[in-house]
């Protein structure tokens, strides 16, 4: 059971963590370069959540690289328990931030038509950042489920 896809110390685990880093960084970059994002709390929360996700995933990707390089086994019950809790916490935060930002973006574009009334708002970048945040969440959810699946077998 220790050969679960995405488990720590494997190539698939490292690829999953690096995918999380790239998509979280891209989401942060898209939102940070959008005009007026700091006026809306949901967008600031998205930046903070993706920043936390980036740090968490980068740290675990570095741990995966170290494990692959030194041939160390990371399938320790204490370590995997920490990974499970961290993955689930960051997954919930990422999903909440992406959902809140998606709600504000839809409100601006479809309900109150802020994007037409105020063309200086970067509604396209808001939407791009939200899509990237949901992609990040899908990667972290995959990782959280694989860690949770691995835990009982240790």
UniProtKB/Swiss-Prot annotation:
It is found in: Cell membrane. It comes from the Eukaryota. It is a multi-pass membrane protein. Homodimer and heterodimers. InterPro entries: CASP_dom (IPR006702), CASPL-5 (IPR045009). It comes from Zea mays. Pfam families: CASP_dom. Residues 38-42, 99-129 are extracellular. Residues 1-14, 64-77, 151-154 are cytoplasmic. This is CASP-like protein 5B3.
């Amino acid at each position: 059971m220790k050969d679960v896809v995405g488990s720590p110390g494997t190539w698939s685990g490292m690829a999953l963590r690096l995918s999380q880093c790239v998509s979280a960084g891209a989401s942060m970059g898209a939102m940070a370069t959008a005009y007026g994002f700091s006026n809306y709390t949901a967008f600031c929360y998205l930046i903070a959540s993706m920043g936390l996700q980036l740090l968490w995933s980068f740290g675990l990707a570095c741990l995966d690289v170290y494990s692959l390089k030194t041939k160390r086994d990371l399938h320790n019950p204490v370590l995997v328990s920490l990974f499970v809790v961290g993955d689930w916490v960051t997954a919930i935060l990422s999903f909440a931030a992406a959902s809140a930002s998606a709600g504000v973006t839809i409100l601006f574009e479809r309900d109150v038509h802020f994007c037409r009334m105020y063309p200086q708002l970067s509604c396209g970048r808001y939407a791009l950042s939200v899509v990237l945040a949901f992609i990040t969440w899908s990667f972290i959810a995959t990782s959280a489920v694989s860690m949770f699946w691995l835990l009982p077998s240790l």
